[in-house]
Regions:
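A short, active-site helix/loop in glycosyltransferases that binds the activated sugar's phosphate group
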Residues: 1-21, 26-30, 34
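Conserved donor-binding/catalytic core segment of Leloir-type glycosyltransferases
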Residues: 45-63, 69-73
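Nucleotide-activated donor-binding/catalytic signature segment of Leloir-type glycosyltransferases, i.e.
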Residues: 81-85, 92-117
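Short alpha-helical donor nucleotide-sugar binding micro-motif in glycosyltransferases
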Residues: 121-126
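Aromatic "clamp/platform" in nucleotide-sugar-dependent glycosyltransferases that forms part
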Residues: 134
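Short hydrophobic beta-strand element within catalytic cores of glycosyltransferases
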Residues: 151-154
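Conserved acidic donor-binding segment of nucleotide-sugar-dependent glycosyltransferases
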Residues: 166-167, 171-178, 186-192
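A short, well-ordered alpha-helix in the C-terminal region of glycosyltransferases
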Residues: 180, 193-208, 214-217, 221
């Protein structure tokens, strides 16, 4: 990400050296939109507003589930959402499930999930995917969700800024603000963006052909510098 590149440029080791950012690639043949209703039925998810949150360990402090829970609590307390009209879908492992007791809306924890087909089904079932991490070097979950037509909401502090174009294909909340994260969730629920538009924001920036071309251009520029 450009955020990581900026950190590299400011380091003692890389200071004064050229740093180029080339993003991760996403296989668009593996992450594809699925039918929402069918996906929800298959996963046992009710037909309400669905928010997805996933991580290798959902209880890891750095992943910021506490911010999402606080955002949902804010929405319920201010009556901007009704607790029985929202379902939080969690996927990933956990060493402790104590934090789940604080979730103020209905939720379903799917546990560890593997395979692009299963992940695509989760993203397709959701209306919003939230990444409330303290930082992300890139944000792979966000581009996976976009490719499946799900609107991402995240903080504006790190690698997510490369992926989410604020209020165009998602929402970037003020870092550490559960209230602004809540605003992002409401915005995503009330401003549906077409599946094709969301997916296209990945196709044009993270498809194999686009990223491969960036590598080719970088190699060519390095070779050109060596011959001059």
């Amino acid at each position: 990400s450009n955020w990581l590149a900026d950190i590299a440029r400011s380091s003692r080791l890389m200071k004064g050296h050229a740093v180029t950012t080339i993003p991760n690639v996403l296989s668009l043949q593996k992450f594809i939109p699925c039918d929402k209703a069918t996906s929800r039925t298959d996963l046992g998810i009710p037909n309400v507003k669905v928010i997805a949150f996933g991580a290798a360990r959902i209880d890891a402090e750095i992943k910021g589930l506490r911010y999402l829970i606080a955002a949902l609590r804010h929405l319920v307390d201010t009556q901007r959402v009704k607790k029985d009209e929202v379902c939080l879908v969690l996927f990933g492992g956990a060493k402790s499930t104590a934090l789940l007791d604080d979730i103020p809306v209905g939720y379903k924890w799917l546990g560890k999930v593997s395979g692009e087909n299963n992940l695509s089904k989760i993203y397709s079932a959701a209306d919003v995917v939230v990444s409330s991490s303290m930082y992300e070097t890139f944000g792979q979950t966000l581009i996976e969700a976009l490719a499946c037509g799900c609107v991402p909401v995240s903080f504006n502090n790190s690698g997510q800024r490369d992926i989410i174009l604020h209020k165009q294909n998602g929402y970037l909340a003020q870092y550490g603000s559960a209230e602004d994260l809540a605003e992002g969730i409401v915005w995503a629920m009330n401003n549906p963006i077409s599946c094709g538009e969301l997916r296209n924001s990945v196709v044009t920036r993270y498809s194999e052909s686009v990223v491969a071309q960036q590598y080719i251009e970088l190699y060519n520029s390095i070779l050109a510098d060596k011959t001059t």
